[in-house]
Amino acid sequence: MEYVVARVGRPHGVRGEVTVEVRTDDPDTRFAPGAVLRTDPDRGPLTVATARWHNGTLLLTFQGVEDRTAVEGLRNTRLVVDLDDEADPDDDAWYPHQLQGLAAVTTTGTPLGTVKDLLTGGAQDVLVVTGTDGREVLVPFVTPLVPRVDVKRGKVVLSPPGGLFVELPGEPEE
């Protein structure tokens, strides 16, 4: 399965550097010089020549793409990797597509809804769960609230605080 790890942005300077919108949690490893990335739409594989951070933006150059005009042709190209080619040594890490559609249940097995998405954030990741009542609920992806993820069995076990999924007495209805 392909996973988008970045989107090529606008050129930076005249020597083939390009800004990159990062969509991976490990950009320093993913975009290390020598890394080969596939493209969507297909413009052939790109090999990272250099990578550096400038004011919080990742700047890359690719082998064989050496000037501003050539880089401009890559604008909005998605950089993808094939997850099947990668070994995942971390049993405690998931890609959003692995969690989307999983059943969200309590520690006692009571259905709470379905995982819609995984948002990556500064402090912690957040699960977006569509509750059984149709509301979207944001659940911080931390062990006390999400004690177990079982992708093979198709479920995420949650231990939500009172009121997160169930209306509390006296709460106004939306």
Curated annotation (Swiss-Prot):
Ranges for domain PRC barrel: 91-164
Cellular component GO terms held in the UniProt record: cytoplasm; ribosome
What single Pfam family name could you report for this chain, choosing any that match? Answer: PRC_RimM
Keyword terms: Chaperone, Cytoplasm, Ribosome biogenesis, rRNA processing
Entry's localization field: Cytoplasm
Q: Name one GO molecular function term.
A: ribosome binding
Domain of life, per lineage:
Bacteria
GO biological process annotations for this chain's record? ribosomal small subunit biogenesis; rRNA processing
What does the record give as the function of this protein?
Answer: An accessory protein needed during the final step in the assembly of 30S ribosomal subunit, possibly for assembly of the head region. Essential for efficient processing of 16S rRNA. May be needed both before and after RbfA during the maturation of 16S rRNA. It has affinity for free ribosomal 30S subunits but not for 70S ribosomes.
Domain comment in the entry: The PRC barrel domain binds ribosomal protein uS19.
Give the record's subunit note: Binds ribosomal protein uS19.
Assigned protein family: Belongs to the RimM family.
PANTHER family of this UniProt entry? RIBOSOME MATURATION FACTOR RIMM
- This chain's protein is named Ribosome maturation factor RimM
Q: Which organism is it from?
A: Kineococcus radiotolerans (strain ATCC BAA-149 / DSM 14245 / SRS30216)
